[in-house]
């Protein structure tokens, strides 16, 4: 969902094939990268199935249902507006996450203490799953989140989810310390006085 423009504002495309909702007349350009990837996977599955009516074999339907959970997590964690396609994908994905068979999603639900829920809310995804996935990226270790969501090894998924949980706790502590330091600096400089606010 990043604009493809140069410094002057003109459309600037790389010399490689791209899939981007902001070009080619797509009706809604507010989708996040996770939804772009999901839609690309859906189209590839339809082409691979070779059915002109878009019917998919059950194994591809099951896979795409699981991938919709990832698209929903990405939509909510990326904080794109929950309107139009985003709302539909988030709603469907939220209903499906608890049944998702992706080992990394199952492990992430366990470390977030959400594995016993029948249906998650956007708040739970946004404040309990998203931060665990995003924290590693903020601290320069995004590969761990990608591996978590891509691995088929349940033991590896579990250890990665635990590691992401630990990094998220570290990020929370760092944020808390920084807020305390900022508050102390503000107080030391008299910004608690009415005339300095």
Regions found by a protein language model. Give the residues of each.
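Fold-independent oxyanion-binding glycine-rich loops
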Residues: 1-2, 21-23, 40, 73, ...
């Amino acid at each position: 969902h990043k604009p493809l423009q140069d410094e002057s504002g003109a459309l600037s495309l790389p010399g490689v094939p791209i899939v981007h909702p902001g070009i080619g007349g797509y009706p809604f350009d507010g989708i996040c990268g996770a939804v772009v990837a999901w839609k690309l996977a859906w189209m590839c599955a339809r082409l691979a199935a070779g059915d002109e009516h878009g019917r998919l074999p059950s194994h591809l339907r099951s896979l795409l249902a699981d991938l919709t959970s990832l698209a929903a997590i990405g939509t909510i964690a990326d904080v794109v507006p929950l309107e139009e396609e985003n709302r539909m994908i988030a709603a469907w994905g939220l209903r499906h996450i608890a049944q998702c068979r992706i080992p990394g999603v199952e492990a992430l639900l366990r470390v977030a203490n959400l594995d016993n829920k029948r249906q998650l809310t956007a708040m739970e995804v946004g404040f309990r799953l998203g931060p665990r996935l995003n924290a590693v990226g903020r601290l320069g270790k995004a590969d761990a989140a990608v591996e978590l969501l891509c691995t088929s090894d349940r033991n590896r998924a579990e250890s990665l989810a635990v590691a992401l949980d630990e990094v998220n706790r570290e990020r929370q502590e760092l944020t808390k310390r920084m807020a305390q330091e900022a508050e102390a600096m503000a107080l030391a400089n008299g910004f608690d006085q009415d005339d300095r606010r």
